[in-house]
Structure formats: structure tokens, C-alpha cells
């Protein structure tokens, strides 16, 4: 399936709710973001409106961060992504230290948000939809 169709197709299958790129307002863990040629998944949102994301490119998979909503490149999400990549994936981080994505990641991607009510294919037993990116990463990497 082409990348730009993924968010809408997943929603059409009854797995969640679709939002066009102009309707995206926030990011929750698991949000599928799709545009022409690329798909990424949100890990969570930070207080400055930036998002920690998980994406794959030809070299491999990486945690990365978007700019803050105000356009500031040195966002909370970029700092979190750098910290986790450097700590848990040091060889990968040494080879690919840039964990910053551009503002297009916030404006040019449609969104599919999972239905976590139990009526579809997903639930949220950890209640990640209510947590910040920092809290989610700490839980995923067992920093309790």
C-alpha cells in the first residue's frame, strides 16, 4: 500500500480515526502518520508541542524529534530522542547523531489515531494516551 494512503486505509478498516494533515492538532502514542513516500509513528508529545517519533529510513530505525510548535528546532522531543538514542543505541547514535526532523513532520502528514476502546484491534492498558513522551519513553525503557 502506498505510504500516503496508509493512515486513511487503516481508519477505513475500522482501526481508528483519520485526520487530514490540516486537521492534526496533537500526537499520542501509536498515531500513524502518513504522507507521500513516508510513514512514521508517534511515541508521544512534549509540552512544547514537539513530538518524539519512530521512523525508518534506508539506514534503519531511529527515535527522532520534531521542532516545537513555535518552530524552535532545539525542541524537547529532539533532546529526548538524542538522550535515548545515545544511551540505549550508542553505536547507532555515533553513526547517525542527527535526531532532528524538520517542520514538515508536523504539517505534511495525515494521521490515524487508534481506537483503543476495545471495539477494534487495540487497547491502551498502560494509558499512554494520557502520558507525555518523556513518561512513555521512561516506561518503555523501564526507568521507573
Regions found by a protein language model. Give the residues of each.
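Low-complexity, Gly/Ser/Thr/Pro-rich intrinsically disordered linker/tail segments
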Residues: 68-144
Amino acid at each position: 500500500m502506498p505510504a500516503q494512503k496508509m493512515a486513511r486505509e487503516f481508519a477505513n478498516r475500522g482501526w481508528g480515526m483519520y485526520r487530514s494533515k490540516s486537521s492534526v492538532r496533537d500526537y499520542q502514542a501509536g498515531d500513524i502518520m502518513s504522507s507521500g513516500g513516508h510513514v512514521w509513528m508517534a511515541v508521544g508529545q512534549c509540552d512544547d508541542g514537539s513530538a518524539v517519533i519512530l521512523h525508518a529510513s534506508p539506514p534503519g530505525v531511529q527515535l527522532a524529534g520534531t521542532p516545537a510548535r513555535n518552530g524552535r528546532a532545539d525542541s524537547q522531543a529532539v533532546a529526548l530522542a538524542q538522550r535515548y538514542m545515545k544511551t540505549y543505541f550508542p553505536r547507532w547514535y555515533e553513526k547517525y547523531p542527527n535526531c532532528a526532523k524538520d517542520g514538515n513532520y508536523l504539517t505534511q502528514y495525515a494521521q490515524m489515531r487508534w481506537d483503543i476502546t476495545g471495539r477494534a484491534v487495540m487497547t491502551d492498558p498502560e494509558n499512554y494516551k494520557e502520558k507525555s513522551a518523556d513518561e512513555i519513553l521512561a516506561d518503555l525503557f523501564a526507568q521507573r
